[in-house]
Structure formats: C-alpha cells, structure tokens
Amino acid sequence: MTALNHWQPSADIKNLLKRAKIIAEIRQFFTERGLLEVETPVLSEFGVTDLHLSTFSTEFLAPFGEQSKTLWLSTSPEYHMKRLLAAGSGPIFQISKVFRNEEAGNRHNPEFTMLEWYRPHFHMHRLINEVDDLLQQILDCPPAESLSYQFVFQEYVGLDPLSAERSELIEAARKHNFMAEDNEDRDTLLQFLFSEVVEPQIGKERPIAVYHFPSTQAALAQVSPEDQRVAERFEFYYKGLELANGFHELADAQEQRHRFELDNQQRQKCELPTREIDERFLAALEAGMPDASGVALGIDRLMMIALDCEKINDVISFAMDNA
C-alpha cells in the first residue's frame, strides 16, 4: 500500500471521540481531587539506566557554531515530575506522550500516551485505592482485588518467589519452554514465570493490584521496612493487560545513585551501552523530595478496555506504520 492511499487514521473517528471524552473525564477526576496538571519536557539531556528500557535519541544540532549534543526522548515523565515535587508543587498529574524503542504490536506502540501522578504523604496502599477509584469511574468495573506478589506467584507457579532455590526456578521455567541456562539470573527467571504463568491467570473478572514485588525489582521504589525482601511497588492488571506500575517513591539520593550504578554495571555485562546518570534528578532528591507515592498508567491500554478493542491501533489516531 502506497503512502497516497494509506492516509486514513488507524482508529475509527467514533473511537477517537470516545477517547477524547474519557481523557476529559480523567482530567476532571484529578482536578476535583486537587491535583495540579503539569507539563514536562519530552526531550532530555539524560536517558535512563534501566536495563529493560530502550530509549529513542536524536541530535540537537546547536546552531551558531555550538557543539551538537544527543538528546533523549522521554520514556516517562517521572524524573521531571519528581523535580517538581522537590520544588514544592504538591500533588501533580500529567497526561503525556512517551517513547520506547521497543516492539510494535497489538498491545504496544513505540509512541504512546501515559497518565502519571504523584501524591505526597500517600502510602502505597492509599494510592492503590485511588487507582481503583479511577478504574471504577472510567471502566464501570468491579472494585479491584489486592494481593501480594508472593501470594499470586505461589498460587500459580507453586513456588515461593522470595525463598525458592534458583534450581527450582530454573526447573519451573524450563517446564514452560524457557531455555534457562544453569547460571540464569534469578530476576530473569522470576520475571519470565510471572509474565508467562501468573499474568495470564489474574485480573480476568476484576482489576487486580499486585503489590510487594521482590526488592531486586524495586526500580525507583522504597524497600519495605517490614520485610527487606520486598519493595513497596505495585502493578495493576485487568483483562489480560498490565495497566499501571506504581511505587512508594525512593527519596534517598545516595541509594538511588547506587541503583543507577548497578544498572550500568548490568548493562556492561549484557554488552549494552551505559547511560549517563541524571544528576539533576539526584540533586532534587538531595534537596529533599517529600515522602510520596506515584503511579504511571497506560492510557492507550485503558482505552482498549473501555472501548472493548483487541488492538492498540484501534484506539490511537495513527499507529507507527501509519504515522
């Protein structure tokens, strides 16, 4: 098909009209609760160290003879929004375009829309309740169920993810057609088993919040003071889709730097390029970000459920192959 006859939108106009109405409803939800809507840059001088995120880059040509520089397209507005929190913004939300140089398919588009919000002085479970409120309002769905990562993993894999021997995890992964090496990384095994065995079984009839992921998967979340084996991190699943990922946010600049450095060490082991650490973000943590919880929710996947669509292309105006 040539570009001349491949001009029409990916989604039906009626779906785009419904999408606009839902986004307006989301904005009203947060405005009525006293959150400030913010806008942060899509381009940044820093990428992300996360081993599992592939970032788009572009070159700023810097006119007037200045040296050009590489800029990175945002994978999430998280770092900038936390800088706003540290500056005293109070509770904030944002609906923004984000970019990940990864797969395109029925559930993924490299450019997508993310809703992200932060609540100073909220603990993790209070934010889980607010995500639940939003989903019930937008999707008219039953209240969410909250279960620990340890519980659902034991329920569907039959192993305790926090205490199982690596050999047991390898055996379980191989039963599910994962060609695990004898020295396979423990987190790789846990992530495979969770995504391939657990996720397809949960959130079918109602949303489910899975909380207390292993501390080795904390990312930017705090480790639980009650149990150092788990992080104060949660994810929401519904109708076969991962919808949201939230944290009781890590505010310790020294610990965050250490995690970034570990990310880069892992990148080197995997023969991936290292990423420069975002010193501005760490400076904001050092200055004092308030204790807060935050969450990112995929708007396009939310629309897939709200509009009963199987493909992400049916809820966005122009997919990557039609942009």
Swiss-Prot record:
Its EC number is 6.3.2.-. It catalyses: D-beta-lysine + L-lysyl-[protein] + ATP = N(6)-((3R)-3,6-diaminohexanoyl)-L-lysyl-[protein] + AMP + diphosphate + H(+). ATP binds at R100, N101, E102, N109, E242, L243, G298. It comes from the Bacteria. InterPro entries: Aa-tRNA-synt_II, aa-tRNA-synth_II, aa-tRNA-synth_II/BPL/LPL, EpmA, Lys-tRNA-synth_II_C. Belongs to the class-II aminoacyl-tRNA synthetase family. EpmA subfamily. This is Elongation factor P--(R)-beta-lysine ligase. It comes from Haemophilus influenzae (strain PittEE).
